[in-house]
Design a protein with these regions (language model features):
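Intrinsic low-complexity/IDR segments
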Residues: 126-208
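Thr-biased low-complexity repeat/linker tracts and other Thr-enriched repetitive architectures
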Residues: 1-131
Length: 208
């Protein structure tokens, strides 16, 4: 039941199916897939090997490309770009001139906008509100599993942490580290990362 209408174009090996809608001046091309109840409209582009599916909306001048995935109830709009191996999903919103790329994930109720650049192995989650590249900090490989830890600004102008299956405030993170890794080198690593995040992340009223 997919619809393609207006001046929209679907070309090359691209697929649009399910109840997806592509309209306005939107373009879906290369090997891109748009399906489910996804809507791609305005002057938006989905290309490369990118997938947009679920209840997503891709609008304005947004462009999803590379091997990027946008799914769930996520919205990407404005002049935003999602590329490479990045994922945007859940109820996340990426807009403005924001860029999400490399292996970064933006999910939950997170908002990334303005001139923010979210990249590397960042995991921006939950109530994150990132509109400046100084609103998040990633450290890794770190810890007993050589993983990555992401510290990010929230809509309440506080710092939260995502590390593996852990998600919580900065103090909750430190408490968890002490409980799990107390007395080990990993405790030192994580605590140093937390202290560095406090210095690097800019909260409201702080200059860049």
């Amino acid at each position: 039941n997919a619809w393609v209408y207006g001046d929209a174009r679907v070309s090359e090996n691209a697929w649009v199916y399910g109840d997806a809608r592509v309209f306005g001046n939107a373009r879906v091309f290369d090997n891109a897939w748009v399906y489910g109840n996804a809507k791609v409209y305005g002057d938006a582009r989905v290309s490369g090997n990118a997938w947009a599916y679920g209840e997503v909306q891709v609008a304005g001048n947004a462009w999803i490309y590379g091997d990027a995935r946008v799914f769930g109830n996520a919205w990407v709009y404005g002049d935003a770009r999602v590329s490479e191996n990045a994922w945007v999903y859940g109820d996340a919103r990426v807009f403005g001139n924001a860029r999400v790329f490399d292996n970064a994930w933006v999910y939950g109720n997170a908002k990334v906008y303005g001139d923010a650049r979210v990249s590397g192995n960042a995991r921006v989650y939950g109530n994150a509100e990132v509109f400046n590249t100084r609103h998040f900090f990633v450290q890794g490989p770190i810890g007993s599993r050589d993983g990555y830890v992401t510290f990010y600004r929230t809509k309440d102008d506080t710092v939260e942490v995502r590390c593996g299956c852990f998600s919580g405030s900065l103090q909750e993170f430190v408490n968890q580290v002490e409980e799990t890794h107390g007395g080990s080198r990993y405790e030192k690593e994580y605590k140093l990362a937390a202290e560095l995040a406090k210095v690097c992340i800019r909260l409201e009223g702080e200059s860049r």
